[in-house]
Amino acid sequence: MKRLKIFLYLGLVFLAYPSWMEARHIPPIVSTQWLNARIGDPSLTILDVRRVEAYQEGHIPGAINVYAGAWAYKKGVLFNEIPDQAELNETIGAVGISLSSAVVVVGNMDTVREGYQTIRVACTLLYAGLEDVAVLDGGMNKWVKENRPLSQKVVKPIPREFQGRYRTDLFADKAYVKENLGKIILVDVREPAYYSGEKKLDCVARPGHIPGAYNLPTSCAFNSDGTFKTKEELLVIAESVTGAGRDREIITYCDTGQCCPTWHFIMRELLGFPRVRIYDGSMQEWGADERAPVTK
């Protein structure tokens, strides 16, 4: 009986680490100390997604720069949409990244907009088929505060042809969300005032949220200095809306698709939730469709 319990325990541990997590060679969230020890490692690509002016003022030695805006674009009236695959192949190939590359995405994590953009870039690379993608915990602001090395040398990558293995199951469109209402766990990552309909952005036609959605603000995932909360804390927060079971599919959304990748990244890459998607169109698209239900 004791041996059986041990086997059962090991089986549960195995199930806790899905295949994509086992395939990783770097953790999804890396510390400044971890990255500092690997400066100059030819097997690691440091991708700085800040604006070029900030990059030129000082960046982590060896980092290449592609502004976060290049990794999402306006599609019709919708902001922050995932690029077409051909365009994304070109963007990734231009900076010399391959499917086997290990990439650490670096941005400023002490500002809401830039922090969310940084994580969205990481999710975009995962969508393209990379496995070893991480974000720098605390971002450049923490790196600079700790007086870690900086460089002003502009790094010119060697372009290469890139052909992604696209994980279309990481995203959901409006039709998919509509069809699966009541079957999926919808996670609205906006602040409570926007979830409740008390406030709304100008680009969102109707205030409120998708019926049945739980509110899990993205800001809950971070400490005041822009670092992530601990894995244990994040699991407790995530399970407050998803429950302990992991069988149901989870779809995250926000206003324009900019900040909902954060909880997607945390749940899937750090916590190992097996079925998590991003609704890219989010409330900007949903609210514009009069046939799509909205509640307060």
Where are these regions (language model features)?
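Helix-loop module immediately N-terminal to the HCX5R catalytic loop
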Residues: 73-102, 218-250
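Solvent-exposed loop/turn segments at secondary-structure junctions
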Residues: 51-54, 69-73, 109-113, 140-142, ...
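Thiolate-centered catalytic microenvironments shared by cysteine-dependent enzyme domains
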Residues: 82-176, 199, 208, 259-276, ...
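N-terminal, post-signal-peptide region of Sec/Tat-exported proteins
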Residues: 43-85
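Bacterial N-terminal signal peptides that target proteins for export
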Residues: 1-8, 19
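Flexible, polar/low-complexity N-terminal or interdomain linker segments that lie immediately upstream
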Residues: 14-57, 140-206, 294
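Cleavable N-terminal signal peptides
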Residues: 10, 19-21, 257
